[in-house]
Amino acid sequence: MRGVSDAHITAFRPVPRTGVIYVTTEAQKLGFRFGAEGWCNLGQGQPETGELPGAPPRVRDVHIDLDAQEYAPVQGLWELRESVASMYNALYRRGMPSQYSAENVSISGGGRVSLLRAAAALGTVNLGHFLPDYTAYEELLDVFRLFSPIPILLEPRRGYAFTAEELEREIVGRGLGALLISNPCNPTGRVVGGDELARWVQVARENDAALLIDEFYSHYIWRDGDDPAPMESAARYVEDVERDPVVLFDGLTKNWRYPGWRITWTVAPRTVIEAVASAGSFLDGGGSKPMQRAACAVVTEDHARRETAAIHQEFGRKRATLLSRLRALGVRFDRDPEGGFYGWGSVAALPPPLNTGMGFFRAALQEKVITVPGEFFDVNPGKRRGGRPSRFRDHVRFSFGPEAAVIDTALERIEALVRWYDR
């Protein structure tokens, strides 16, 4: 007789787990749970959420009025939409004639929900996406069948660089109507910024190709510069907020270090906002009203700058520690991360079985260290590219999102692991 775990309801397909969910599930088989003592989670996709020196105090209480027990509008509370628009104008658009308004903003209950709404609102277009990129894009790009996902390869030997000229060639040559990217890129840490990003926006404008830019790590910028609170957003290079085909996704998850609030936003021309709100009406119904109201207090220019400055100091130190100690073991980085809080390294030079992403993950897991094998970022919607080995089977994503003490302990265990297999 089949057990419950063996049962299969034929109406449902097997849904693959994203990279972080997969590694977390495997760790749970060995006793891991969030907050469990002794575990070091370098696979996590969230930053540490406690107090940081110089940052605004953490929000610890949320007051819920009686009217906040009701549904929020699908497109979000008007006052929060106004706060987001005002913050973007203050951070990126001072002195520019075209300014964002509340009508250019839609609020969602999480980053994946924001992206899901946008994907559901796309028409019958070719949608370009890069390899490697964020693992959750894989199912997102497959579940809706109106658009066709078109992969664009980035080369490790070039540090995953991609020029505006190459972008235009892809748009024109492949007939792309839209492009989905994470910037900074998760997992490589590559940042398209400054004049380069301005040219990308210009190419999109001139070719009427929508740029869908996941900017959830845009306050974690590690390029050299004098700004104590560096941020990067394509909002800075939009000429006309109603005409330029630029759609931005961000929220409190990473840049404010409030992942549990599930407050995110989409910033775009009004016609796009109307479309994603319509999609939200049948996909998710809208986000949490009390949390949106509470978010208004932290979605300000001053709060963003102070939080980013604190992140830059604390996470910058963790980044330097992680990169230097992993590099000393033989982990090779195609490029040092310019943004985000991940190191994307090749373990090919390590002793077997640590010389593949999955082998490294399995061995480190026995030492209660969680990482994410690189093959999960080889986004392959519908598994259409067949059974050939992933180009990133030798890569691992290491997070420096956790507290410094957790990172130090994890690195000590990895160092001991390499010494053991290198005997």
Language model regions located:
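N-terminal small-domain helix-loop-helix segment of the aminotransferase-like
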Residues: 2-109, 166, 299-306, 420-423
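Generic structural signal for small/hydrophobic residues in well-ordered secondary structure
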Residues: 23, 42, 84, 105, ...
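Helix C-cap/helix->beta junction micro-motif
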Residues: 34, 174, 206-207, 329, ...
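Conserved core of the PLP fold type I
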Residues: 68-207, 218-241, 247, 335
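PLP-dependent enzyme catalytic core of the Aspartate aminotransferase-like
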Residues: 86, 90, 94, 169, ...
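Conserved core segment of the aminotransferase class I/II
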Residues: 87, 142-143, 236-313, 320-329, ...
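Hydrophobic beta-strand scaffold residues
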Residues: 148-149, 211, 333, 371
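Conserved glycine-rich beta-strand-loop-beta hairpin in the small C-terminal domain of fold type I
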Residues: 296, 312-323, 333-348
